[in-house]
Swiss-Prot record:
Keywords: Disulfide bond, Glycoprotein, Secreted, Signal. One of its GO terms (cellular component) is extracellular region. This is Expansin-like protein 5. It comes from Dictyostelium discoideum. Disulfide bonds join 48-78, 81-140. It comes from the Eukaryota.
Length: 238
């Protein structure tokens, strides 16, 4: 019996993502110095769109940070992880889930507004602000696969995608309608969604990491607030 491997590959990618694997770390290991940190308590429902941190789209813990205005980069850093260290070699890894827009510290080039739990690993809360920190970007220690949620209010004429639970940073999200051979790139918003007005019928979402890997998931029709498991996760040798 002759097996059509090409057909099998097409069937697999129509439902779950096949990753173009890469063996190198997509992050620069250069340590950035001169960072600072404060802490805040209103951590749920941050600007990155993850909602409640222990909810279905959140990281599942409170090891998070709101990024200063410059570091936030209009939402491009949402869902990415940073290992922050102090001069005493204490370190903590946090995920970016929010932006810090207040005047003052949040306007510094490399400022993190941490959860009280994360802040306390680096210094006493009584200090209020920590200076002289360093950081490096690292893969996120997530469990399971990359997931996609369709924004509340999505319909057959407009929808917006939240990509979450990704171990490696997302570079681009694109969609391809059923019957088309062309992927249309979407533009990320400052609140970390990827909107589209061409979602009639079945379509495929393609998620590209900064390491050049791709994950695919087919969405048969638009259902507001529905979460899709892509069945795949980005790899990393970091």
């Amino acid at each position: 019996m002759r097996i059509n491997f090409k057909l099998i590959l097409i069937i697999l990618t129509s439902f779950y993502g096949i990753i173009n694997c890469q063996s190198t770390c997509p992050y620069s290991k250069t340590v950035i110095n001169g960072a600072s940190a404060t802490f805040y308590s209103a951590m749920d429902n941050g600007n990155c769109g993850f909602g409640k941190l222990t909810g279905p789209t959140g990281p599942g813990n409170y090891m998070i940070a709101a990024l200063g205005t410059k570091l936030y980069q209009n939402g491009a850093q949402c869902g990415q992880c940073f290992k922050i260290s102090n001069s005493k070699n204490a370190s903590v890894t946090v995920m970016a889930t929010d932006s810090c827009n207040d005047a003052g510290y949040c306007q510094r080039d490399n400022h993190f507004d941490l959860s009280p739990t994360a802040f306390s690993i680096l210094g006493a809360q009584s200090q209020g602000v920590l200076d002289g920190l360093s950081y490096v970007k690292v893969p996120c220690r997530v469990s399971g696969n990359v997931k996609v949620m369709l924004k509340d209010g999505s319909n057959a004429y407009w929808t917006s995608f939240l990509v979450f639970n990704n171990a490696i940073d997302v570079k681009q999200v694109s969609i391809k309608l059923s019957g088309s051979s062309t992927y249309v790139p979407l533009t990320q918003t400052t609140y970390n969604y990827w909107p589209s007005s061409i979602t009639a019928g079945s379509f495929q979402v393609r998620i590209e990491s900064i390491g050049g890997e791709f994950i695919y998931v087919t969405i048969p029709s638009v259902v507001s607030s529905k979460i899709y498991d892509t069945g795949s996760q980005f790899s990393s040798s970091c």
